């Protein structure tokens, strides 16, 4: 497998899952830092869904269209951060732009984890 980078989208096997946890083979977005991606046997990802009707209005969901090699409008689910073994990654699909990662994905992760967010004017 080629070097895995933050912002890459892969098909991955998330296993069985319980209740509302995302499960099975599905696209995931790599959110782990690149140093960890290089050295660690595990990888931190966010599941991606095409069930947009459930994603609307949730601040932890980021809609992506015509990005990252996905064929359908999809939503990245920042509330379901998961760490998996790299052997569960299969096919590379594409990469989100650095702008999308910085602006949208990072903000959704901050909301999920309760971290301070930047306001529109750049101040905290």
Where is each model-derived feature located?
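Short, charged beta-turn/beta-strand-edge "cap" motif at the junction between a beta-strand
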Residues: 15-19
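C-terminal terminal-subdomain/extension
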Residues: 2, 66-124
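Short linear motifs in intrinsically disordered
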Residues: 1-2, 53
